[in-house]
């Protein structure tokens, strides 16, 4: 018997607004092919592993001391990386880092959201946005995307003007549908905002065919924050490092809400080592894009409806019963993601042999799992 197991969550004085909520989480199952969390399937190079090992070892010698509270060296390295990637001249004062981009988003809502304030998102999109809004007691508003899951900019502009949210979430490329938002559309959204901050979630930005929204920060310094992560293209999911790019005043706001010494010295050392090997790691992006296009074509030829993607995943359907189909993929040793969109499932782009396994399973399932209206096409 586990100590204390006689009580349940209902017995605790939980906040009323959290009762009935479900925690975020993708299934963590031991199966031959895992394509459900949008990780980079290519492991770090031996040179990177050696560099991380050496760097963490050096940091470990100082574990009796607190880490650099503001992670200045890491933020400087992130600025250098983005200078090269975006062509925008950034400095350490433009960067903030935390334990994954979810902590970055939480800190943003702690600073700019909260009771009496609201945030809007265009759904379906990243499911952590409303969860973080709930956790910070920020009122969550939402508007629908277009039928193809793309962002309907005209509708978004109208919703922003009518509802006047304090925060606007835009994900580019969008998770789970994969479409990127062009800079001209971002400008329209920003121009529609009389006040408030647009949080541009670029977790999959390295895969995108569109320029980064970082290019617009100087034009909209009070309105735009760009959130990014090292968990996806950077193959650093286990390292848990997210960051944001914004005007220096936004970084000052982060200092007001961050917990002291929130980034361990080991995390900072490992992330800096990973950044030193950025070129080698990100060489896998082109391979993953080619595989994405191959998988999309293969699924289309089988008769599936494939949502065009600008990321390292594909949303596809239409299934008569998506949860049941998800289980049938799992029965064949392929773990993909049921993201809660009726009729659709999402697959990460993995290694070539993993993608082959997905296509093989799809070929077996196509005759029985597609919705009747689509199966007749």
From Swiss-Prot:
UniProtKB keywords: Amino-acid biosynthesis, Aminotransferase, Histidine biosynthesis, Pyridoxal phosphate, Transferase
InterPro entries: Aminotrans_II_pyridoxalP_BS (IPR001917), Aminotransferase_I/II_large (IPR004839), HisP_aminotrans (IPR005861), PyrdxlP-dep_Trfase (IPR015424), PyrdxlP-dep_Trfase_major (IPR015421), PyrdxlP-dep_Trfase_small (IPR015422)
Enzyme Commission number(s) from the entry: 2.6.1.9
Cofactors required: pyridoxal 5'-phosphate
Protein's GO biological process: L-histidine biosynthetic process
HAMAP family: HisC_aminotrans_2 (MF_01023)
Keyword Transferase listed: yes
Organism annotation: Mycobacterium sp. (strain KMS)
Reactions it catalyzes: L-histidinol phosphate + 2-oxoglutarate = 3-(imidazol-4-yl)-2-oxopropyl phosphate + L-glutamate
Family stated for the protein in its record: Belongs to the class-II pyridoxal-phosphate-dependent aminotransferase family. Histidinol-phosphate aminotransferase subfamily.
Protein name, as recorded: Histidinol-phosphate aminotransferase
Modification N6-(pyridoxal phosphate)lysine occurs at: 232
Assembly with partners or alone: Homodimer.
Pathway: Amino-acid biosynthesis; L-histidine biosynthesis; L-histidine from 5-phospho-alpha-D-ribose 1-diphosphate: step 7/9
Gene Ontology MF: a single term: pyridoxal phosphate binding
